[in-house]
Structures are given as structure tokens and as C-alpha cells.
């Protein structure tokens, strides 16, 4: 009798995943990678686990900046707060701030204000501006402001001069001093003028010896312009305040004029601290100079108030023009070097002990415009968001580290560093926000949630942030009001594309640990239909293996999602699969 054809049984496979390799938003994933995650962490790698709950410390009013010092510092509603307490520095303008730490001081930009965290009475403006319309007296003096008592002004040498007589040669505009022991006149190398006026003590309160200032309105033209104050003070009465400048006047004279003294800071796009100076950069049109400027600056050594102190000393302030075109996009102190970024440049300054600082240029991926706050040092590596990817930089050329984020376009990145982790909040092309975490030690990315972070700051054993809802949050939950419920999820990529035949998924074995009242649900999607099918629920406490039977369904490919609440650790996921024919 004829033999009938026999049907061959399908091949059954058991696939176990016990190493979870983080987030990878790509079409093809390696074993253990996840296409999407919510509120998971790499802390327990190779396990998959939910992150710690965050703690909300406060809801702020008009927050404007965040700074990491010994205590958390921030601006809210126009006031600087240190360790959650308001300081005397109030009246700050609305909007985003750059808070820069220099020693015990906090410098606030663009307001150009400062506050001393060790002396609460020491605060105010970095700039100073004073003017007077009235009588001003000019007197030749020494560097200490002591007037010359025997000063002769003439076109020829005085007859029978006494020892120590000063003579202003009107023809040559030089000052000579007579020595009776040598019988000769010797030129005085530097001549000073004491400028005395009535300021009611305002000038000594606003300015100090060593300030670099802009002076206008003095009757002696040589005393106007950018000047160095060799002395500032007041006589026995506050109506007789004075400054000491380099310059020559023909004896003690008094004029009536309108005088103005200004100590000014340049307008700067970004400001950082490095090697006991503040450094800044500026690109844009200067309405005073009527030209576009493209410059970097630094303050005088140890003096954040002085940016126009030019005495030929190693401690002077400094400025340099830059040839590369385009706006500045960020700045950071990287390994003791002031480092400034454009979208296609990295400019690094080598600080010199002699004051001859050197500006170097590297043509490469720089910081994306709007992502200045993505700059973070983790370990000794600098991370930042470029126009195309997330970069790691160690002084040579940047290396991309964000292939796992897929081909999405992100902007407005804000970064934070905690331990070996790089936190990065940024917006995608659909205007949705994402908080990613890159574990630099393990080389793994994870996506936490949609938190829109305005600024990060690490203080002690906590990473703080201010979000778009003005909440001051402890990311590791060490303080504040903890989240009531932590929802988490993981989603695989497309599974079993390597098998061309149709297949059946019959069961899942999931080994996990769950805290009390934690739950988890399993969902399946078949053949990219876009719909998730509820395939089982897990509700248990402690560690154990849960078997989830799946109703067999023939498909070409599939995806799986696990979503739940509460603290969970997943040790492994085993899948039983039967591969059939291609029909």
C-alpha cells in the first residue's frame, strides 16, 4: 500500500538571557539589549533592576541656577540660597544664571554679582560706577599718594635747588629730582598724580588699590582712559577722597569738571573658574565699539572683579581675539585648562605662570548650540553633546559614545555627573524629553524617563537637579519627599529575525526578586502590529522563578515588554520557542 508523507515536528529552542546590556534604540539588537526602558538602572549589572526613588526637596519660585559647593547653592525668585537658606544677595534678575565658584565666593552671571559664603556681609556687584560734577584737585605725588613738598615747574633748571627738589621740565615733559650730595638732576622714572575730590567715602567703598578702571572727564587728558589705581583712600574727612594715577600735572591745580570712574566686566557668553581666575568668552556685536567681537578673557589672578588690569605682570588680566568663526557654545575647566567650544572647534588655553597664556585650536566636533550644560567630567574624561552624537574627549579628538541612542536627533542637552555615571536630559525631534544615563564604567546606556532637567549639581553623596516644573530633586532620594509609586518597564527589540520560518512562543520563565506589593505584567507584540497583548501578571515577594505560559501564536517575529511598579531585580528571562515551517 502506498506510503503517506509524514509531518516533521518543529524544532524547540530554549533561550536564556541572564545578562542585560542596557538601552539600544536600534533596529537590530544584541542579546540582552533593550529597545526601550523606563526607570531602570545599571547599578546591579548584569541584572536588570528598577532605579532608586527620587526625593523632591522643594518647589522653587523662578529658579535660575544651581551650583555644587560644600553645600547646595541655587537662585530662586531673585535670591541666592546657600544650603537651602536665603542669603543677603537679593534683587537678581529673572532668567537663567551661571553660578561660578571661586574660592569661598559665588559669582552670579549675567548679573555680575558675588557672595562670600564665609562672610555673609561680603556681597555685592563685581562692577563699580561713580561720577561727580564738582571741584577736582590734581597734585604731583609719590606712589603712596604723598604730595611733593618742593616742586618747581619751569623751562630751565632751578637755581640753587635744595636736596630732594622736584623739577618739571616744561619743554621735555619730564620730572627730575636733585641730589645735593651728587650735585646732579636724576629723572624720575614714574610720576604720579593724586586726584582729590568729594565722594563722601563712596570711592574708597567702591574701588581699591590695584583696580583697573575706565576714567573720563578729568581735566588732564593723560589721566583719562584705562588706568590702574595705585592708591585709593580718604583723608581725615570723607569729603577729601582720592585716587593715585600715573601722570604729570604742573603743580597743585583745581578744576571743575564731571568725572566718572568705572570698573567694568566684559559681556560674556560663558564663564568658568580655572587656576584662581575667572575665564570667559564672547561672540557678538559690541554697540560701544561698533564691531563684532570674538574673544576670550580672564580676570586678574585671584581677583574676579578686575578684567582690565594691565601692568605687564604675570598676575594681570588677559584677553585674546579668536580667528575661528561662529558663536561660542560652551566652556569648562578641563584638567586645569580653560576650554572653550564652538560647534566645530575646541579652543584650549594653556595657562602660563608668566602671564603669556597660549590659545590652541582643534578643528573637530564641538558642543552643540544650546547644549552648553551637557559638558561634564566623569572620572578624567569630558563628555558633551555635539550636533551629531554624545562625545567623550580626553584632549585629542572626540570619540562618539552614543550609538545605542539610535538615529534620533537630540538638542538642548543638560548633563550631570555622579560617580561613574553621566546623566543627560535632552529633547528629541518630536519635542519629547528623555533622561538618559551612561554608565561609563560598564559602557551601558539606560533611559530613565521623560524628566526635563534644567540643571544638575552634585553635592556630597547626592545628585541634585532642578526640573522644568521648578522642583528641586535629589536624584538618589537621600532627602526630600520620595516618589509615591515607581513605575518601570523594559521593551525588547524585534526577536527571532534570525529564524526565517514561522515560530511559536509557548512560555516564559522569569527569575526575579520583588519587594512587597510590587507587580509586573508581561505584554507581547506579534509581527509589528503595534498592539501589545496582555500575556500575564506577576505579583510576588522575594526571589524566585515565575513561569508565564503564553498562548501559542504563529508569527514571523515578535517583541516583549515587561512593565510594573515597585522595586524589582530581574536575574534572567528564559523563552521556549518552537520553530515551524515557512508556510
Predicted regions and their residues:
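Structural motif
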Residues: 78-81, 114-120, 286-302, 344-350, ...
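Short, surface-exposed terminal/edge motifs of secreted or surface/virion proteins that either
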Residues: 79-84, 112-128, 165-189, 228, ...
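Short hydrophobic/aromatic-rich beta-strand motifs
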Residues: 72-73, 104-108, 158-177, 210-215, ...
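Beta-propeller and closely related beta-pinwheel folds
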Residues: 264-416
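Beta-sheet repeat architectures centered on beta-propellers
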Residues: 2-71, 366-370, 377-381, 388-583
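Small/polar beta-strand repeat architecture
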Residues: 9, 126, 132, 143-144, ...
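Extracellular/surface-exposed low-complexity repeats and stalk/linker segments enriched in Gly/Pro
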Residues: 88-95, 140-166, 190-193, 405-414
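Beta-strand-rich domains and repeat architectures in extracellular enzymes and scaffolds
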Residues: 51-76, 265-273, 325-329
Amino acid at each position: 500500500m502506498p506510503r503517506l508523507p509524514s509531518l516533521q515536528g518543529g524544532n524547540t529552542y530554549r533561550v536564556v538571557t541572564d545578562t542585560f546590556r542596557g538601552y539600544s534604540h536600534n533596529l537590530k539588537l544584541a542579546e540582552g539589549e533593550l529597545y526601550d526602558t523606563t526607570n531602570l538602572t545599571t547599578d546591579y549589572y548584569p541584572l536588570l533592576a528598577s532605579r532608586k526613588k527620587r526625593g523632591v526637596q522643594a518647589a522653587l519660585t523662578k529658579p535660575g541656577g544651581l551650583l555644587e559647593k560644600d553645600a547646595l547653592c541655587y537662585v530662586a525668585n531673585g535670591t541666592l540660597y546657600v544650603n537651602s537658606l536665603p542669603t543677603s544677595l537679593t534683587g537678581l534678575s529673572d532668567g537663567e544664571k551661571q553660578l561660578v565658584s571661586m574660592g569661598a565666593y559665588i559669582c552670579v552671571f549675567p548679573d555680575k554679582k558675588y557672595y562670600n559664603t564665609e562672610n555673609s556681609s561680603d556681597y555685592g556687584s563685581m562692577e563699580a560706577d561713580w561720577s561727580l560734577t564738582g571741584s577736582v584737585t590734581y597734585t604731583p605725588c609719590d606712589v603712596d599718594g604723598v604730595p611733593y613738598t618742593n616742586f618747581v615747574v619751569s623751562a630751565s633748571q632751578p637755581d640753587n635747588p635744595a636736596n630732594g627738589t622736584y623739577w618739571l621740565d616744561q619743554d621735555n615733559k619730564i620730572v627730575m629730582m636733585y641730589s645735593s650730595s651728587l650735585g646732579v638732576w636724576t629723572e624720575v622714572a614714574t610720576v604720579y598724580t593724586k586726584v582729590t575730590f568729594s565722594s563722601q567715602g563712596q570711592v574708597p567703598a567702591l574701588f581699591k588699590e590695584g583696580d583697573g578702571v575706565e576714567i573720563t572727564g578729568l581735566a588732564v587728558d593723560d589721566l583719562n582712559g584705562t588706568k590702574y589705581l595705585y592708591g585709593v583712600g580718604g583723608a581725615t574727612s570723607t569729603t577729601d577722597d582720592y585716587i593715585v594715577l600715573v601722570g604729570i600735572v604742573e603743580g597743585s591745580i583745581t578744576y571743575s569738571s564731571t568725572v566718572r570712574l568705572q570698573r567694568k566686566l566684559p559681556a560674556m557668553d560663558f564663564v568658568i573658574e580655572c587656576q584662581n581666575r575667572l575665564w570667559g568668552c564672547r561672540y557678538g556685536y559690541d554697540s560701544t565699539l561698533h564691531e563684532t567681537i570674538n574673544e576670550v578673557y580672564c580676570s586678574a589672578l585671584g581677583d574676579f572683579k578686575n578684567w582690565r588690569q594691565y601692568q605687564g605682570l604675570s598676575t594681570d588680566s588677559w584677553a585674546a581675539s579668536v580667528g575661528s568663526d561662529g558663536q561660542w557654545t560652551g566652556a569648562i575647566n578641563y584638567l586645569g585648562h580653560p576650554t572653550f567650544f564652538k560647534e566645530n572647534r575646541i579652543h584650549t588655553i594653556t595657562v602660563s605662570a608668566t602671564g603669556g597664556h597660549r590659545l590652541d585650536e582643534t578643528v573637530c566636533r564641538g558642543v552643540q548650540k544650546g547644549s552648553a550644560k551637557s559638558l561634564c567630567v566623569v572620572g578624567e574624561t569630558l563628555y558633551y553633546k555635539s550636533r551629531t552624537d554624545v562625545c567623550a574627549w580626553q584632549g585629542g579628538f572626540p570619540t562618539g559614545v552614543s550609538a545605542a541612542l539610535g538615529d534620533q536627533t537630540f538638542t538642548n542637552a543638560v548633563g550631570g555627573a555622579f560617580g561613574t555615571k553621566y546623566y543627560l536630559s535632552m529633547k528629541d525631534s518630536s519635542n519629547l524629553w528623555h533622561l538618559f544615563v551612561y554608565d561609563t564604567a560598564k559602557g551601558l546606556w539606560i533611559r530613565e524617563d521623560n524628566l526635563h532637567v534644567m540643571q544638575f549639581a552634585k553635592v556630597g553623596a547626592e545628585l541634585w537637579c532642578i526640573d522644568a516644573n521648578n522642583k528641586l530633586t535629589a536624584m538618589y532620594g537621600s532627602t526630600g519627599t520620595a516618589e509615591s509609586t515607581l513605575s518601570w518597564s523594559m521593551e525588547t527589540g524585534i526577536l527571532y529575525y534570525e529564524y526565517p520560518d514561522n515560530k511559536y512562543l509557548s512560555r516564559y520563565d522569569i527569575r526575579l526578586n520583588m519587594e512587597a506589593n510590587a507587580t509586573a505584567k508581561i505584554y507581547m507584540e506579534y509581527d509589528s502590529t503595534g498592539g501589545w497583548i496582555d500575556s500575564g501578571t506577576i505579583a510576588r515577594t522575594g526571589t524566585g522563578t515565575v513561569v508565564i505560559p503564553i498562548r501559542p501564536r504563529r508569527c514571523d517575529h515578535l517583541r516583549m515588554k515587561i512593565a510594573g511598579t515597585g522595586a524589582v531585580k530581574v536575574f534572567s528571562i528564559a523563552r521556549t520557542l518552537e520553530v515551524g515551517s515557512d508556510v
